[in-house]
């Protein structure tokens, strides 16, 4: 499924239409360096990390069994987004790589909190996981200082398997409406 293509998201939902789901972990995400628009006219980072992730889960919610769980990947960067910034404020002139990524994570976290309230009556748990800074291609900023960051910073970041731990904890926990990190559980 291509989360930057709404038709692809709809096709994935259709392919899963006869499937009962015990859990869904939403772990796809991007951080675009430049401002680009999807074929639907949405900024690409917001489209993948928020809009189509939300559309996918809204469409699949009826297929999640009682006692099932939905998990959304968030980021600590979300706390640095000012309250007055929203998806409508992102355009060619206001776009920033990290700023837009952080906004997408703030939005998906807010969506997850609201969904946790709505899904509670059906016995469906909804949580977020924050993997921390994981050694992956996502942290490459495609800037002149990447080689320096690789030398001084990469040795201190988490291996990918440790980044998966919060998602597993969030999926298996009896709690709902929480953010799971490697060591802690936070209320939204």
Where are these regions (language model features)?
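Active-site Tyr-X3-Lys motif and surrounding loop/helix of classical short-chain dehydrogenase/reductase
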Residues: 11, 40-47
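Conserved helix-to-beta-strand junction in the class I
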Residues: 63
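Conserved Rossmann-fold cofactor-binding substructure of NAD(P)-dependent oxidoreductases
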Residues: 2-20
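Conserved hydrophobic beta-strands of the Rossmann-like cofactor-binding core
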Residues: 21-25
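C-terminal helical subdomain
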Residues: 128, 150-188
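Ankyrin-repeat alpha-helix packing hotspot
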Residues: 50-51
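A short, exposed helix-loop element centered on a Lys and neighboring polar residues
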Residues: 57-58, 113
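Catalytic loop of short-chain dehydrogenase/reductase
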Residues: 30-37, 43, 69-121, 130-143
């Amino acid at each position: 499924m291509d989360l930057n293509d709404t038709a692809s998201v709809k096709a994935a939902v259709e392919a899963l239409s006869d499937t009962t789901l015990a859990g869904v972990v939403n772990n796809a995400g991007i951080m675009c360096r430049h401002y680009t628009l999807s074929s639907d006219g949405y900024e690409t980072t917001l489209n993948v990390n928020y809009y189509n992730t939300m559309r996918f889960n809204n469409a699949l919610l009826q297929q999640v069994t009682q006692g099932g769980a939905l998990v959304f990947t968030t980021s600590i960067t979300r706390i640095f987004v000012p309250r007055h910034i929203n998806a409508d404020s992102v355009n060619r002139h206001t776009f920033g790589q990290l700023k837009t990524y952080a906004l997408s994570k703030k939005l998906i976290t807010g969506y997850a909190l609201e969904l946790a309230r709505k899904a509670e009556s059906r016995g469906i748990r909804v949580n977020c996981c924050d993997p921390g800074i994981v050694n992956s291609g996502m942290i490459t900023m495609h800037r002149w200082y990447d080689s320096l960051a690789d030398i001084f910073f990469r040795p201190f970041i988490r291996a990918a398997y440790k980044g998966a731990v919060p998602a597993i904890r969030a999926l298996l926990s009896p709690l709902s409406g929480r953010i799971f990190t490697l060591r802690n559980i936070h209320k939204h």
